[in-house]
Amino acid sequence: MSYVNRHLIHQINQSARLIAKKANEQLEPFGLYSSQWSVLYCLRTIGPMTQKEIWSYLNVEAPTVTRTIKRLEENGWVQRRQGEDKREKLVVLTKEAEKKYEEINVKMLKFEEELLADFRDEDKEAFSHLFRMFLQQ
């Protein structure tokens, strides 16, 4: 087994933690954490979703998403609405969240650009390709 294979998962995990830490610094002025931003991004990109759809999409355990949504709801970022089925609750962005979203997204896109500035476009494409493959497993 090569050195790369023995340490790749650890390196990915450490990189993800570092990115989350730096993202939290960017999101602090908005009173958000990266885990909360992931939910907001998901809802804005995909649209209203059930909690199950959110945790499935984000590959996060249900209790974690439940707590995150509860905090977002308490802080006015999301609300739960009745779905088509009476038992189904959809999570949606509030009007206030919709207004603030673009400002936050611009900041996060700039953060991403700065974070990846030293990488060649080919490297970024390779990262993207490999992560898509990994997520499809």
Curated annotation (Swiss-Prot):
SMART domains: HTH_MARR. This is Uncharacterized HTH-type transcriptional regulator YwoH. It comes from Bacillus subtilis (strain 168). Residues 51-74 bind DNA. The gene is ywoH. Keywords: DNA-binding, Transcription, Transcription regulation. GO terms for molecular function: DNA binding; DNA-binding transcription factor activity. SUPFAM superfamilies: Winged helix' DNA-binding domain (SSF46785). It comes from the Bacteria. Residues 5-136 form the HTH marR-type domain. Pfam families: MarR.
